[in-house]
Amino acid sequence: MSVIRIVPEPRPLLDQVFRLGESPIWDDRRERLFFVDIDAGEIHHVTAEGSSHRMWIAPPPDRPTALGLTSAGRLVVALTRSVVFLDPDTGAWDALAEIDVGLSTTRLNDGKVGPDGAFWVGSMDERPVDEREPVGALFRVTPDGRVEKKLDGLVVANGLAWSPDGRTMWLADSRGPWIDRFDFDPATGEMSNRSRFATPDEEMGRPDGCTCDSGGFYWSAGVSAGRLNRFAPDGRLIEHWDLPVAWPTMPCFGGEGLRSLFVTSLARPGVAAPARATVPAGTLITLPAQISGLPPHRFPDPRG
């Protein structure tokens, strides 16, 4: 089966360049897209049309790396080495859990709320690429603040997603590079039957952040190739979407009917972008999708 190449016509959502845009998540109650700029220490939200832009700054020297939504309307936020709550209405921060990531050069990275109601977050070696080692791990944080290490031996944990029925989990290592599949029990949070799902290379697009659509297809940001890769549930690459922005970091579905894609990207000052990149690197873009996404799971909030 041949791979379909799609050249979409996205538009920038904001007239702003972000240093390391990541973790977009659509809040269906507020009808806002939340996302982070890790290196700037910022959390942002904006409407699907690009209006009502607001920003929150993480308590220095911490940096926000990943977001989830809670049942009470707060955000659950992965910082460098901890997980906290942020109330977007009041700006109040509340602690949830400290995470022992090991080395001082290791930090938390990609994270999401799973179908089990826990916040899952991976860690990464933040040293220069040629010095990185598999010191990262995958953690599960429960609403009462308990932390369980579920997996270790990762270089850059990334690409967390779950299937529509919650019984398949995906995890990527951006420096593996690989994407693995697990059987998942949404009642207990147990992972089993690990298998290799895909091995995207630099040309195909090193796997960064991801999302899953309503058909159970896995969308991976191919950060090194400037594209989105759409994989079938059996691991076959069926589409790749060439993007006009270099270095995309993570897609998510949102907007009306969850039929828009939002894609964050990173800026690399001093590095020339590919010739086809017509949008500045670090731009947040949006484009119509051919299929709907899945509503995000919500973290049970102690506030109710």
Where are these regions (language model features)?
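Blade-level signature of beta-propeller repeat domains, shared across WD40, Kelch, NHL, RCC1
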Residues: C252-G304
